[in-house]
């Protein structure tokens, strides 16, 4: 049999059969090599077992990759993304004018959405065109489409189910309202966590200057240079001069007390100082709070930079690379939200985990009733805005699973914010 015949026959094998055939050949080669090298029998067995686990993992990874590719092909069946624009020049690679995806006019953007099953019944095409040209760009608006389910069969396979352009506009507006509410909450968490550190310094009779010197001394050479360099730049008269805090920093730069440092530190460096204080005072609760504050800082940055949030509230959203903080999970247990599959699924979503950190921090750091009441009112208005469109979005058990993520967030608001009022 020729080599081409053998290759042709191998293509008729199933993925599993081909995997077994390949593994058997590799085992023989691997075993003979180990024998030639004088490996003992037990070492040979251990090596072959290790190889078996490796190839099994490789096979499973390949199967998962192929399944994902098949899913992507299914979802993109009705999408014109892979089709070249007939009005533009394209080469044999499918690229258009040197780019994989050309810029679309507003008219083409609407046509693209229609080809994916998006309807224009609640908002007509002319109004949609004005929205895309004046209110919000196409990239951000269409990003919310991932929250809706697609047809999995029939003539309209791959198209979105019951998705109108008005739904994208509504979610874009709700997302903007979320960012505004979250950002204000983040600002208060930063402020009151700094107030807590200052109060703890006073309670522990810390020398306000000595603690800052100790903090700087325990930093690495690069960390210290980076921190001092940033402060000097803000205090200088150059381009990076801070017109709000620069004069204060300049006045105390060479001998800075803790109350000035807390005013000068941005949120990120402050979390490092918070951890330093936790270690200095051997306070395990503060150590855990430090990790929560880092999550709040990440959410604050996203809100301040106007990043979309709601479009990631799905099971496909980016996963948190860490287990939920004990302070948060213990509080959830105390409030009756136990360690269920639903809770684990929601908190595995990085955005939900950061939102949970913010809401817990509001309860933990913002102890003034007037502060909590102010935030409770804002969250109530945000919830009303979402609930006003609930009929369009469906219920938790419907295909649009993002609704259950919002429901989980409302539960967190109830236990950590609303119940405090």
Language model features by range: what are they?
Residues 306:
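Acidic/aromatic/glycine-rich contiguous surface patches that form carbohydrate-binding/processing clefts
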Residues 3, 46-48, 52, 56-298, ...:
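Extended intrinsically disordered or low-complexity regions, especially N/C-terminal cytosolic tails and loops
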Residues 2-70:
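Modules that initiate DNA replication and primer synthesis
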């Amino acid at each position: 049999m020729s080599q081409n015949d053998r290759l042709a026959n191998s293509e008729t094998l199933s993925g599993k059969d081909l995997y077994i055939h390949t593994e058997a050949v590799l085992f023989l080669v691997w075993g003979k090599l180990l024998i030639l090298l004088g490996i003992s029998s037990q070492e040979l067995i251990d090596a072959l077992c290790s190889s078996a686990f490796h190839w099994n993992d490789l096979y499973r990874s390949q199967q998962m990759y192929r399944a994902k590719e098949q899913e992507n092909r299914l979802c993109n069946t009705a999408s014109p993304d892979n089709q070249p624009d007939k009005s533009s020049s394209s080469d044999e690679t499918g690229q258009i004018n040197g780019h994989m995806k050309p810029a679309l006019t507003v008219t083409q953007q609407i046509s693209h959405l229609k080809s994916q099953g998006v309807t224009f019944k609640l908002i007509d095409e002319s109004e949609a065109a004005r929205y895309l040209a004046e209110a919000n760009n196409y990239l951000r608006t269409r990003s919310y489409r991932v929250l809706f389910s697609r047809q999995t069969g029939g003539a309209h396979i791959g198209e979105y189910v019951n998705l109108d352009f008005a739904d994208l506009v509504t979610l874009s507006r709700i997302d903007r309202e979320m960012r505004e509410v979250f950002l204000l909450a983040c600002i208060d968490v930063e402020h009151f966590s700094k107030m807590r550190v200052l109060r703890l310094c006073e309670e522990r009779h810390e020398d306000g200057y000595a603690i800052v010197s100790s903090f700087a001394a325990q930093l690495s050479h690069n960390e210290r240079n980076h921190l001092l360099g940033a402060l000097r730049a803000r205090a200088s008269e150059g381009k990076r001069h801070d017109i709000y805090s620069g004069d204060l920093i300049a006045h105390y730069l060479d001998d800075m007390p803790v109350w000035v440092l807390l005013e000068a530190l941005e949120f990120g460096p402050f979390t490092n100082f918070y951890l330093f204080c936790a270690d200095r005072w051997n306070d395990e609760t503060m150590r855990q709070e430090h990790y929560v504050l880092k999550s709040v800082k990440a959410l604050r940055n996203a809100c301040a930079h106007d990043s979309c949030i709601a479009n990631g509230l799905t099971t496909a959203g980016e996963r948190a690379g860490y287990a939920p903080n004990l302070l948060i999970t213990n509080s959830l247990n105390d409030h009756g939200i136990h360690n269920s599959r639903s809770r684990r699924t929601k908190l595995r979503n990085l955005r939900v985990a950061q939102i949970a950190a913010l809401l817990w921090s509001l309860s933990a750091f913002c102890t003034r009733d007037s502060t909590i009441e102010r935030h409770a009112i804002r969250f109530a208005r945000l919830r009303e805005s979402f609930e006003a469109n609930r009929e369009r979005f469906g219920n938790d058990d419907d295909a649009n699973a993002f609704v259950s993520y919002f429901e989980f967030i409302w539960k967190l608001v109830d236990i950590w914010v609303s119940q405090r009022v």
